[in-house]
């Protein structure tokens, strides 16, 4: 066992003495030691209940003969960090989480790991660590929040963000907004739509590093606790069979992940996280792969923000296994990859008798919402390395549109202009210097996109940025523009008054300038150098790569 590095032999008597100080018995010291990484804290609604999940995991480990040993992980709530300097720390926290788990599991050589995340950057950070360490590992998330209810309709956090814009336009009173904000998030759990956290939890299940049900069983259900107990027991089986993350994460599981990403209509943040995760397994996933698979994958779901349904509805409709079964009817799912059940994807689908139970929530594969996937990748003279848009959440009027650029050098400047009624129909709000390097930290632009939607401009105004978006963003929100402005990217050459041509079906985005004018501006262009708010963010800015490669660290 790996733990024998610290428990076995004469020379390890001092190590055993320290373990006895924890209250362990001699029998426990000689059993498999299972690291339990618990990301619980009291500030994130998606993590406030993870101690309950952790207790169930520990029970499962003990039932199967192991010794659970808990250690913590940090986490950032993107909703609470939104629209202030705290958002600069969200994406960088992904690398810190991966690094800290590597440190803990190497300094203390556990035999296996159970990872307990739930929200946006914690899930990919833990998956990156799992593949980097490559010891038997299983992921069990905290589960999604239930949707709220107001006036007989389902509401969620994005409803509140958009409510701010509605108040600004006089379409909602502040008293109504107060009722809404107290109704939208009724339980613990990751925010209830197909936002980033739930996107990543669903894809963890798809990839095979989490048990069936992990992506969709609500946080408040007893079934979630039972799943956690099962995960604790199953890690002992994975240890016994020596099934490791890189046995599970292969080229075929990569294809499954991107296919499900497109069918479900997941967050554009998956285009950052999946390349970073697969990179740890030595697999390359670039934007062209996303686009190729998107063109050949039907979009079967329109969950919030694209539609009125939520993760609880997807769970009742058959969950992730149901969607995979539906896609497998046309050969779009690889059935061979191993999973943490100890069985292949195909064996899981057969054993569970998986299928879609409600075709109002998950459309039939031969009658999809669209014949293409939820995310499109665009290229052009302002995005030579690409940019992304959640096309499943774009109004038909904005799929192909010519817009007038209004350029801002920060999110704050753009929000002030939007809420100050300076943006009109036909505009493209262009926000520069919000990329991984230039932000630094690649902040989410949920506040400006929600303001645009809430003010009734979602079908007439685009937002283009080298920053990124919340999974709750809807509308013509085109992000991850690469190269970013801070790296000298052509997006930085765009000026207010320029005409931008957006063609999502044609996969292009261009500023309408001749090459001579582009070269003239390029020769005169000097990227703005921001004063770094901290030494940590300065180090991050110096070491992070482009959004087009997953915003991972330089080698």
From Swiss-Prot:
Positions with a binding annotation for [2Fe-2S] cluster: 119, 191
Pathway(s) served: Amino-acid biosynthesis; L-isoleucine biosynthesis; L-isoleucine from 2-oxobutanoate: step 3/4; Amino-acid biosynthesis; L-valine biosynthesis; L-valine from pyruvate: step 3/4
Keyword Acyltransferase among UniProt keywords: no
Cofactor note: Binds 1 [2Fe-2S] cluster per subunit. This cluster acts as a Lewis acid cofactor.
EC number: 4.2.1.9
GO CC annotation: cytosol
Keywords for the protein's UniProt record, in alphabetical order: 2Fe-2S, Amino-acid biosynthesis, Branched-chain amino acid biosynthesis, Iron, Iron-sulfur, Lyase, Magnesium, Metal-binding
Tagged with keyword Ribosomal protein: no
In-chain residues carrying the UniProt-annotated modification N6-carboxylysine: 121
Reaction(s) the record says it catalyses: (2R)-2,3-dihydroxy-3-methylbutanoate = 3-methyl-2-oxobutanoate + H2O; (2R,3R)-2,3-dihydroxy-3-methylpentanoate = (S)-3-methyl-2-oxopentanoate + H2O
InterPro entries linked: Dihydro-acid_dehy_C, DihydroxyA_deHydtase, DiOHA_6PGluconate_deHydtase_CS, ILV_EDD_C, ILV_EDD_N, IlvD/EDD_N
Gene3D superfamilies: IlvD/EDD C-terminal domain-like
Annotated positions binding Mg(2+): 78, 120-121, 444
GO BP annotations, alphabetical order: isoleucine biosynthetic process; L-valine biosynthetic process
GO molecular function, one term: magnesium ion binding
Pfam name, any one: ILV_EDD_C
Residue ranges of the TM segments: none
Active site: 470
Cofactor requirements of the protein: [2Fe-2S] cluster; Mg(2+)
Quaternary structure and interacting proteins, as annotated: Homodimer.
PANTHER family named in the record: D-XYLONATE DEHYDRATASE (PTHR43661), D-XYLONATE DEHYDRATASE YAGF-RELATED (PTHR43661:SF3)
Function: Functions in the biosynthesis of branched-chain amino acids. Catalyzes the dehydration of (2R,3R)-2,3-dihydroxy-3-methylpentanoate (2,3-dihydroxy-3-methylvalerate) into 2-oxo-3-methylpentanoate (2-oxo-3-methylvalerate) and of (2R)-2,3-dihydroxy-3-methylbutanoate (2,3-dihydroxyisovalerate) into 2-oxo-3-methylbutanoate (2-oxoisovalerate), the penultimate precursor to L-isoleucine and L-valine, respectively.
Family label: Belongs to the IlvD/Edd family.
NCBIfam families, alphabetized: ilvD, PRK00911.1
Name by which UniProt lists this protein: Dihydroxy-acid dehydratase
């Amino acid at each position: 066992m790996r733990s024998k590095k610290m428990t076995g032999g004469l020379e390890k008597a001092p190590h055993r003495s320290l373990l006895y100080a924890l209250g362990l018995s001699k029998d426990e010291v000689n059993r498999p030691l299972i690291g339990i990484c618990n990301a619980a804290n009291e500030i994130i609604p998606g993590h406030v209940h993870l101690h309950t999940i952790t207790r169930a995991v520990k029970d499962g480990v003990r039932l199967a003969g192991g010794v659970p040993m808990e250690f913590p992980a940090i986490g950032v709530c993107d909703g609470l960090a939104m629209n202030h300097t705290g958002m600069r720390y969200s994406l960088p926290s992904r690398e810190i989480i991966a690094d800290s788990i590597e440190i803990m599991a190497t300094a203390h050589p556990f035999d296996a790991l159970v990872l307990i995340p739930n929200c946006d950057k914690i899930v990919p950070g833990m998956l990156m660590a799992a593949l980097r360490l490559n010891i038997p590992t299983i992921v069990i998330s905290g589960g999604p929040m239930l949707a709220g209810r107001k006036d007989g309709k389902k509401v969620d956090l994005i409803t509140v963000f958009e409510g701010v814009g509605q108040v600004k336009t006089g379409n909602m009173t502040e008293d109504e907004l107060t009722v809404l904000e107290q109704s939208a998030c009724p339980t613990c759990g990751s925010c209830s739509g197909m936002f980033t956290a739930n996107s990543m939890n669903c894809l963890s299940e798809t990839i095979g590093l989490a048990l069936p049900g992990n992506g969709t069983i609500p946080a408040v259900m007893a079934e979630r606790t039972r799943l956690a107990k099962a995960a604790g027991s199953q890690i002992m089986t994975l240890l016994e069979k020596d099934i490791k993350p890189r046995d599970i994460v292969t080229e075929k599981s990569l294809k499954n992940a991107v296919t499900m990403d497109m069918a479900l209509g997941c967050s554009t943040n998956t285009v950052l996280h999946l390349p970073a995760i697969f990179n740890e397994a030595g697999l390359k996933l670039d934007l062209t792969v996303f686009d190729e698979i998107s063109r050949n994958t039907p979009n079967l779901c329109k969950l919030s923000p694209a539609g009125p349904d939520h993760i609880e509805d997807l769970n009742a409709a058959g969950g992730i296994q149901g969607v995979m079964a539906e896609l497998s009817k046309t050969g779009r799912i690889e059935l061979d990859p191993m999973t943490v059940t100890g069985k292949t994807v195909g064996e899981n689908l057969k054993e569970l008798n998986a299928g879609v139970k409600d075709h109002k929530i998950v459309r039939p594969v031969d009658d999809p919402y669209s014949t293409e996937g939820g995310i499109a990748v665009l290229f052009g003279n302002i995005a030579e390395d690409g940019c992304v848009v959640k096309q499943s959440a774009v109004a038909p009027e904005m799929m192909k549109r010519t817009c007038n650029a209004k350029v801002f050098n920060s999110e704050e400047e753009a929000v002030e202009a939007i809420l100050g009624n300076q943006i009109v129909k036909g505009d493209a709000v262009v926000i520069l210097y919000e990329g991984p390097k230039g932000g630094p930290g690649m902040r989410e632009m949920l506040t400006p996109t929600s303001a645009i939607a809430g003010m009734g401009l979602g079908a007439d105004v685009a937002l283009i940025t080298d920053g990124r978006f919340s999974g709750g963003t809807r509308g013509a929100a085109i992000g991850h523009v690469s190269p970013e402005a801070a790296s000298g990217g052509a997006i930085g050459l765009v000026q207010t008054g320029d005409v931008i041509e957006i063609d999502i079906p044609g996969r292009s985005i261009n500023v309408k300038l001749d090459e001579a004018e582009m070269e003239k501006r390029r020769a005169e262009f000097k990227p703005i150098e921001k004063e770094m708010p901290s030494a940590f963010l300065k180090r991050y800015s110096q070491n992070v790569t482009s959004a087009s490669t997953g915003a991972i660290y330089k080698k």
